[in-house]
């Protein structure tokens, strides 16, 4: 099994290197497959080296993936404090016209993308992060949910919102919820495979347990960084496909610049690990500073804008 794990790691590293040769759809897909392969390779090594917790790690990973994928919409809504559009309008009716237009945009983009009608939810400013302009998509491809913040309704114009919604529906079309759920579940399985308390059930050697603590910390760090790298690749892909879907790359670029300027001037405080864990779902990470930079789930806005400007020139033609 060690040889097989080594082969998976080498093959995945090769795919990752090839994927880094470009920043367009096919190369981004190769990059994602390569990073997922590295995660699976690390897990395979853990399962090969550790007999006791291997089964536990695998079972926990599978259960976590299934539960997170099946109930992702409900889980994310609770984490973000999102409410139905109708409920939001009951106590903030001044947004009725804007939300009606947003719902029409969502319906139009979903139809163009060949997706079923998504559920629209709103994150009120009272949640803290809801005061910043932002958006997210979650749920299965057959039953998607698109969320916008109150800050997005207040700060962005219709063209910019349309560009943002195109990005979010591209995530749904690309099954990014499934990709990120699998990546996070494998990362969880790695952590459990190296868990010192589980392994203590199978050994009384404290030197082995100490090694597992260090190995587990390193494996968890590497897997977390790899999950963040997958998220960054998927953001590039959603930018490209979302801009093509909306037909206006510059509107998305301007929206990203506006969101970045507002977040930079007054970053959202990360009040809990639960909030930080949702960072990869937003179109732009609202949290800033500290160690969060090391685990960035989004590419730099300036790079995203540069790519969108290039795409706009290509779509305009000679």
Curated annotation (Swiss-Prot):
Source species, domain of life: Archaea
Annotated GO CC locations: plasma membrane
Residues annotated as catalytic: 168
Binding note for cofactor: Binds 1 zinc ion per subunit.
InterPro entries referenced in this protein's UniProt entry, alphabetically: HtpX_protease, Pept_M48_protease_HtpX, Peptidase_M48
Cofactor(s) needed: Zn(2+)
Membrane topology, from the record: Multi-pass membrane protein
Chief localisation class: membrane
Enzyme Commission designation: 3.4.24.-
Binding-site residues, Zn(2+): 167, 171, 235
Subcellular location: Cell membrane
Keywords linked to the UniProt accession: Cell membrane, Hydrolase, Membrane, Metal-binding, Metalloprotease, Protease, Transmembrane, Transmembrane helix, Zinc
GO MF entries: metalloendopeptidase activity; zinc ion binding
UniProt record similarity statement: Belongs to the peptidase M48B family.
Name recorded for this polypeptide: Protease HtpX homolog
Organism expressing this protein natively: Methanopyrus kandleri (strain AV19 / DSM 6324 / JCM 9639 / NBRC 100938)
Lineage, uppermost ranks: Archaea, Methanobacteriati, Methanobacteriota, Methanomada group, Methanopyri
The encoding gene: htpX
């Amino acid at each position: 099994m060690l040889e097989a794990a080594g082969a998976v790691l080498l093959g995945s590293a090769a795919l990752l290197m090839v994927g880094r040769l470009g920043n367009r759809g096919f190369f981004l897909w190769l990059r994602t497959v390569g990073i997922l392969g590295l995660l699976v390779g690390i897990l395979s090594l853990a399962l090969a080296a550790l007999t006791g917790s291997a089964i536990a790690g695998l079972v926990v990973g599978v259960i976590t993936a299934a539960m997170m994928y099946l109930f992702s919409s409900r889980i994310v809504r609770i984490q973000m404090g999102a409410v139905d559009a109708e409920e939001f309008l009951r106590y903030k009716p001044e947004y009725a016209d804007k939300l009606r237009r947003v719902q029409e945009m969502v319906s139009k983009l979903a139809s163009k993308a060949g997706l079923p009608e998504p559920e629209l939810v709103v994150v009120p400013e009272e949640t803290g992060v809801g005061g910043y302009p932002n958006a997210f998509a979650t749920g299965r491809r057959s039953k998607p949910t698109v969320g916008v913040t109150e800050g997005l309704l207040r700060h962005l114009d219709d063209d910019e919102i349309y560009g943002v919604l195109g990005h979010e529906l591209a995530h749904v079309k690309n099954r990014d919820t499934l990709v990120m759920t699998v990546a996070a579940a494998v990362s969880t399985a790695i952590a459990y495979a190296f868990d010192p308390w589980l392994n203590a059930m199978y050994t009384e050697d404290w030197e082995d347990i100490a090694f597992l603590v260090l190995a587990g910390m390193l494996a968890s760090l590497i897997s977390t960084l790899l999950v963040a790298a997958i998220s960054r690749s998927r953001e590039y892909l959603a930018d490209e496909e979302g801009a093509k879907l909306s037909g206006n790359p510059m509107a998305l670029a301007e929206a990203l610049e506006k969101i970045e300027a507002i977040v930079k001037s007054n970053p959202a405080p990360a009040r809990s690990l639960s909030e930080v864990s949702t960072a990869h779902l937003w179109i732009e990470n609202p949290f800033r500073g500290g160690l969060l930079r090391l685990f960035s789930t989004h590419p730099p806005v300036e790079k995203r804008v540069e790519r969108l400007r290039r795409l706009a020139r290509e779509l305009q033609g000679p």
